[in-house]
């Protein structure tokens, strides 16, 4: 399956749902004996794991499980980062940009100065950071008074996550100090409004955990070789683990997710389905 070229395919995560449905149909059609199975299909995962965050976990009895939500085949993710959601609003002072620019304090310039000093992108092998949204200004001839930004910090290490978050906030403070002006005898410093909240907890499942052993044994029975990959994204598995349900992430065969080149091979989907059936068996 391929996208039409002008949009995403949606294999993330419809491929996983299709594989799960097919696996359950095979189990039912072949009368395969199995223990209790619980299936949870959440909503709004891409916009912040919303379904998983609002799910009633008292409805689930299982203590471990699998999320079908990573690219490639014969892959499993046992570790994935936690993340902080960072929202910043800077408020400077508006003025006419052509007539009296010196009477203004640009919020956009303050933001630019802060971002230019930030460590962003790949910080180290387990830590990343990004400023993903920036909005501000009302007209080309007005020194912009307000700008808002949304960013994130991610790390497998909670200490590094906190350090990166604090570093990003300190850059805004330093930029505000540098942009401070004296206007009409008054000291004008850009105001900084900050909201930092945990977005999702990290995942760290031991390689000897039952949920891993079961998947590996199922793969061996099929002649497959499940490899471990370090995760970089957030998924429902992060939230389930945070609620005490040990969950790892299995590959679904999808590639190029979130792009116009997204695709998934039917053969790979069958490969994953066979693994699911063997896990259930």
Describe each region flagged by the PLM.
Residues 2-81, 123, 140-141, 152:
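Acidic/histidine-rich catalytic neighborhood of metal-dependent amide-processing enzymes
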Residues 107-281:
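Metal-dependent amide/peptide-bond hydrolase catalytic core
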Residues 1-7, 91-95, 222-223, 254-258:
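Glycine/charged-rich beta-loop-alpha catalytic/anionic-binding loops adjacent to active sites
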Residues 42, 69, 89-93, 154-156, ...:
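Solvent-exposed residues in well-ordered beta-strands and their adjoining turns
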Residues 11-14, 48-49, 58, 100-109, ...:
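Glycine-rich anion/phosphate-binding loop at the beta-strand->alpha-helix junction
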Residues 38-40, 85-89, 148-152, 193:
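Beta-strand secondary-structure signal
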Residues 47-48, 92-99, 149, 196-201:
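Active-site-proximal beta-alpha loop/turn segments in soluble metabolic enzymes
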Residues 65-100, 104-114:
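Phosphate/diphosphate-binding glycine-rich loops and adjacent basic-rich segments that engage nucleotide
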